[in-house]
Amino acid sequence: MAFPGAGPILGAIAVSSCLYFLFDYVPIPRWWDKNAYLIGQMHPDEITGLECPYAYLRQIYGKYHWAPFVHKISPTLQKDDYPKYVMVLEIMDAIHLCLMLVDDISDGSDYRKGKPAAHKIYGPTETANRAYYRVTQILAQTTKEFPNLAPWLMGDLRDILEGQDMSLVWRRDGIGGFPTAAKDRAAAYRKMASLKTGALFRLLGHLVLENDSMDEVFTVIAWYSQLQNDCKNVYSSEYAKLKGLVAEDLHNREMTYPIVLALDAPEGHWVTRALESPSPRNIRNALKVIRSKYVRDKCTAELAESGASVKEWLQLWGRTEKLDLKA
């Protein structure tokens, strides 16, 4: 005997049973799982040919990419003390590349030198952990095999991370956590750059020479490198293609030298607005200020002044992207 309305009820029960089975027995597809981004892609070695994110980034930059600097500092080190020569290059690769791995995660970068950023393939959790693991390995190896280099490495690594922390705090707290006077802003940014980037370059001199006699030179080289990188981020179309985004720093509300100068330029309130709320409109108007002749000329003058005394060193760095984007 059929009961009126039984059909819809039985249908609902059947649908509910099917849904229960699907949700209880069938795993969530990887592409739909919110944790998949953190985990990374399965079998990344089939994509890159390499199982490790550090090895992947090292392949992009090339092994021992600091070698030209080592040869200029000490032309005979490779012959006189080959184990130390190799160790210095291993340390520089490890510290520099591992900082990049974590930096790309912090910035949410999609690309590094035109290639997918490591965390986009291996996942941010594994990429960050591998970076910490590699740095720990190199610290342990240095302490055991070259104990005389360990204090230099530890001190400079501390300074690098202090500078990075300053930059991240500014990004977190926004313009309210940054000095208000133009002179103080520039000084604060230079201090951060001297720690984050300067300590990396000074580390090379400390490791090779085991003294601080090259500190002044490497601080200048580092400042030029930081300034050049800051300028490329907002003025270079080639760099934008490699990063996959124009003005990535501004989108990330990160302080850079052009942005710091633009805060006190005519119409600088647009830069403040973009740092507080990076909407497309605010970003667009802020870029007009950052790319204005006023800011661009100041950046160009600073590049020329800081690079004048270290031209031979800068040729070794080999960065040639053109600053072709204007307001």
From Swiss-Prot:
Enzyme class name: transferase
Question: Which family does the similarity line name?
Answer: Belongs to the FPP/GGPP synthase family.
Presence of the UniProt keyword Ion transport in the record: no
Chief localisation class: membrane
Membrane topology note: Single-pass membrane protein
In which domain of life is the source organism classified?
Eukaryota
User: Which residues get glycosylated?
Assistant: 211
The Gene Ontology biological process terms listed for this entry are:
alcohol biosynthetic process; isoprenoid biosynthetic process; mycotoxin biosynthetic process
UniProt keyword annotation of Glycoprotein present: yes
| GO CC terms of this entry | membrane
**Where along this sequence does the record place binding of Mg(2+) 1?**
103, 107
> Which residues does the annotation say bind isopentenyl diphosphate?
63, 96
Chain ranges passing through the membrane? 3-23
Q: What is the recorded name of this protein?
A: Prenyl transferase janC
Which Enzyme Commission number(s) are listed? Answer: 2.5.1.-
Q: Give the binding site residues for dimethylallyl diphosphate.
A: 112, 196
Per UniProt, where does Mg(2+) 2 bind?
Answer: 103, 107
| Record-level Gene Ontology MF annotations | metal ion binding; prenyltransferase activity
Pathway involvement of the protein, from the record: Secondary metabolite biosynthesis
Per the entry, what this protein does is: Prenyl transferase; part of the gene cluster that mediates the biosynthesis of the indole diterpenes janthitremanes such as shearinine K or shearinine A. The geranylgeranyl diphosphate (GGPP) synthase janG catalyzes the first step in janthitremane biosynthesis via conversion of farnesyl pyrophosphate and isopentyl pyrophosphate into geranylgeranyl pyrophosphate (GGPP). Condensation of indole-3-glycerol phosphate with GGPP by the prenyl transferase janC then forms 3-geranylgeranylindole (3-GGI).
What keywords appear on the UniProt entry? Glycoprotein, Magnesium, Membrane, Metal-binding, Transferase, Transmembrane, Transmembrane helix
Q: Where in the cell is it found?
A: Membrane
